[in-house]
């Protein structure tokens, strides 16, 4: 029996004996056990197979059609080693086209899996990934233009775990699914018959698609039996449009050890951790007593996202300590970040994100008509209208003829697959200035093919846990600056993407292609 299997059996057996009598039945019956994605490693030929298909999943007692990689919902965690090439064979068993994007990986445009990397129904695509970047938690998901939001909503997402020599020398928790736990958080909206209820319309093109049910690794409010000691959580905000703000129900601190692109120089202690759509953070939390506690998400001031039940702290998962000790530690130092180079003489690119004023107004009107003032998340409606210079929106009924599919733009242009906007020089630092001035919507801006450093975020210096390697930056009614460098080729036919990771904004034009 392998050590991991032995530990799993030990944990399972230990749960019953470690809990008081009154809570054993509760643990067994009240909540589902946190599903743990398989950790997928290469076969003898250094290959990995991913099959995209439809299946069925049960939520709240009702069965829904869902999509997954190698299963009914979500997918495995693909384990990659720095310096080792891996070929991934991707089979599409859906009845429609899809793509598979390696979010956070520094790989050439040809294998990045953007909207050009189409896999037809019944088709296959093989990509070879030569990983040369630090240990990190990344992920993979569809990037089919105009349909990314729907395909992710249906269940397509999986993790990528990159390992290197440096991280293996640290005494971090590393028993997969025991004290090293993936946590993929997504909200879903269901129809009355229990199916995933996705719409791309004026309202969702403006504020994004959101639901009233929170899933953690595909389960509603699951529980995890955690050994005593340090518990490592690999957090992914896999929501289409909802930002999250993680905390613990008993106010025990989170120690952030890694962001999108890898380890921070040292742990950063926080009481709450905002995470934007597409972002990953690794945190350690101390499980040093017998008291169960919840990982929760706190209310956020984002349009549409303060509607019940998210107007109050909402449970993500229950963590139940058991009478087994883990061996992981919280190191004082983690990694070394290179000093920022001089910014003198660098190419500066200015990207202005914009939403059609008509879309902004019509979407907001529909949101308020459906959900009331609570949908405004505490924002002053008149101030917002004034900020956008729109005046009264009650005259904005265009009978549904408004073309929202190209209403979101960058530098005045909606996405055009055949026209990259610019060419970045390979191996050269550039300073990108990304502005959201002109609307009050949240735009988590993601850049393919790189891990960058944030120079300023929404007009302020980045928080300590956001000053490491990142692939997504917050833009919300202000300006953010990032220092980027691209080490791989991305010719016109395999251009990289840069876009808002609120998926409905991306699907309706807020994306550009660029070459390297």
Curated annotation (Swiss-Prot):
Induction: By CueR, in response to increasing copper concentrations. It is found in: Periplasm. One of its GO terms (biological process) is response to copper ion. Its main location: periplasm. Cu cation 1 binds at residues 101, 446. Optimum temperature is 55 degrees Celsius with 2,6-DMP as substrate. PANTHER family: BILIRUBIN OXIDASE, CUPREDOXIN SUPERFAMILY PROTEIN. This is Multicopper oxidase CueO. It comes from Escherichia coli (strain K12).
């Amino acid at each position: 029996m392998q050590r991991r299997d032995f530990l799993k059996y030990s944990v399972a057996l230990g749960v019953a004996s470690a809990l008081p009598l009154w809570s054993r039945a509760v643990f067994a019956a009240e909540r589902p056990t946190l599903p743990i994605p398989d950790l997928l490693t290469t076969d003898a030929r250094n290959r990995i197979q991913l099959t995209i298909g439809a299946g069925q999943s049960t939520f709240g007692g009702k069965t829904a059609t869902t999509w997954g990689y190698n299963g009914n919902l979500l997918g495995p965690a693909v384990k990659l080693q720095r310096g080792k090439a891996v070929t991934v064979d991707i089979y599409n068993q859906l009845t429609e086209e899809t793509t598979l994007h390696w979010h956070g990986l520094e790989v050439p445009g040809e294998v990045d899996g953007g909207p050009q990397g189409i896999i037809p129904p019944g088709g296959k695509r093989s990509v070879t990934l030569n990983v040369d970047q630090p240990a990190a938690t990344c992920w993979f998901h569809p990037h089919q233009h105009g349909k990314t939001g729907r395909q992710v909503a249906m269940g397509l997402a999986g993790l990528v775990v990159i390992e290197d020599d440096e991280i293996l020398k640290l005494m971090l928790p590393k028993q997969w699914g025991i004290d090293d736990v993936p946590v993929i958080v997504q909200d879903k909206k269901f129809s009355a018959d229990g199916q995933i209820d996705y719409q791309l319309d004026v309202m969702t093109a403006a504020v994004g698609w959101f639901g009233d049910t929170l899933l953690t690794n595909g389960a509603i409010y699951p529980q995890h039996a955690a050994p005593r000691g340090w518990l490592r959580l690999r957090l992914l905000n896999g929501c289409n449009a909802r930002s999250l703000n993680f905390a613990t129900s008993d106010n025990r601190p989170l120690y952030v050890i890694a962001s999108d692109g890898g380890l921070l120089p040292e742990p950063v202690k926080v009481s709450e951790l905002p995470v934007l759509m597409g972002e990953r953070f690794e945190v350690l939390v101390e499980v040093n007593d017998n008291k169960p506690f919840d990982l929760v998400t706190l209310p956020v001031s984002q349009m549409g996202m303060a509607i019940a039940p998210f107007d109050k702290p909402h449970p993500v998962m229950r963590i139940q300590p058991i009478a087994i000790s883990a061996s992981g530690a919280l190191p004082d130092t983690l990694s070394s970040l290179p000093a920022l180079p001089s910014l003198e003489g660098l190419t500066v690119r200015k990207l202005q994100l914009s939403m059609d004023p008509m879309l902004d107004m019509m979407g907001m009107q529909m949101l308020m008509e459906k959900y009331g003032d609570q949908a405004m998340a505490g924002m002053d409606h008149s101030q917002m209208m004034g900020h956008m210079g729109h005046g009264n929106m009650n005259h904005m009924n265009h009978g549904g003829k408004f073309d929202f599919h190209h209403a979101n733009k960058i530098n005045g242009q909606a996405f055009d697959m055949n026209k990259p906007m610019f060419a970045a020089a390979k191996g050269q630092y550039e300073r990108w200035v990304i502005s959201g001035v002109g609307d009050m919507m949240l735009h988590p801006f993601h850049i393919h093919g790189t891990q960058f450093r944030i120079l300023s975020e929404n007009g302020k210096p980045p928080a300590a846990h956001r000053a490491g390697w990142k692939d997504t930056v917050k833009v919300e009614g202000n300006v953010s600056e990032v220092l980027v460098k691209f080490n791989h080729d991305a010719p016109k036919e395999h251009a990289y993407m840069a876009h808002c990771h609120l998926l409905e904004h991306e699907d309706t034009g807020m994306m550009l292609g660029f070459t390297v």
